[in-house]
């Protein structure tokens, strides 16, 4: 039997809970693409008792997210805690130091520490992926880093944020006012706006 690719998720707000739901719902699809089973083993968040609309019973729980990095049943840490420093940065640094791959949707962390973290990951032969936090999940970083690596980029134009895409699409489709659509986009079930888990 092929060894599964084991994931830990830190942060169970809108994005983290959706990651858990998607991995559970699309396990077979991910296994085909990864050529081995993909499973979440462990989760972590500030409030263990909060209802997130997803079943967390199958997963081990860590109150301290940095402890995810030391677990033997984790190959990759998904960091969706948020913030440029504090627990998010400590977790990513610990994960890389422990030989774990990292996926993050944390724009602030990448903006402030992305270069140093990327260098650390590359030196260790690990993957640090931040595409989930860029351009609403469009594979823009991969296209720039791999597909256009031999070209010189001088500019990139576009709406590169999922919330902006939602707002502009809703305004165009419905004719509603900006403020009304913005308020809808800020609801927790539509967009994760400043919510930290």
Where are these regions (language model features)?
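General beta-strand structural signal in soluble alpha/beta enzymes
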Residues: 61-63, 78-79, 103-105, 128-132, ...
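Rossmann-fold NAD(P)-binding glycine/threonine-rich loop
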Residues: 83-98, 105-146
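Conserved active-site and cofactor/substrate-binding residues in soluble primary-metabolism enzymes
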Residues: 10, 14, 18, 63, ...
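Glycine- and other small-residue-rich loops at beta-strand/loop junctions that grip anionic moieties
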Residues: 12, 79-81, 106-107, 132-133, ...
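Short, hinge-like loop/turn segments at secondary-structure boundaries
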Residues: 57-60, 120-123, 146-149, 174
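Short acidic, glycine/serine/threonine-rich loops at helix termini
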Residues: 20-21, 53-56, 114-117, 139-146, ...
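Conserved anion/nucleotide-ligand pocket segment
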Residues: 145-197
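N-terminal glycine-/serine-/threonine-rich beta1-alpha1-beta2 phosphate-ribose binding loop
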Residues: 1-98
């Amino acid at each position: 039997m092929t060894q599964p690719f084991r994931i830990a998720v830190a942060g169970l707000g809108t994005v983290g809970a959706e990651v858990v739901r998607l991995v559970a719902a699309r396990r077979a699809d991910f296994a085909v693409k990864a050529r081995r089973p993909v499973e979440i083993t462990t989760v972590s968040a500030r409030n263990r008792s909060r209802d997130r609309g997803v079943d967390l019973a199958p997963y081990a729980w860590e109150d301290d997210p940095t402890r995810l990095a030391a677990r033997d049943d984790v190959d990759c840490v998904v960091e969706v805690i948020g913030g440029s420093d504090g627990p998010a940065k400590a977790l990513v640094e610990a994960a890389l130091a422990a030989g774990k791959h990292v996926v993050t949707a944390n724009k602030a962390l990448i903006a402030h520490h992305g270069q140093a973290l990327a260098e650390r990951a590359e030196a260790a032969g690990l993957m640090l992926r931040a595409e989930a936090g860029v351009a609403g999940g469009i594979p823009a970083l991969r296209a720039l880093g791999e597909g256009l690596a031999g070209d010189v980029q001088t500019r990139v134009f576009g709406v590169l944020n999922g919330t902006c895409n939602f707002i502009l699409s809703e305004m165009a489709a419905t004719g509603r006012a900006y403020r009304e659509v913005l308020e809808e986009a800020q609801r927790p079930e539509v967009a994760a706006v400043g919510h930290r888990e």
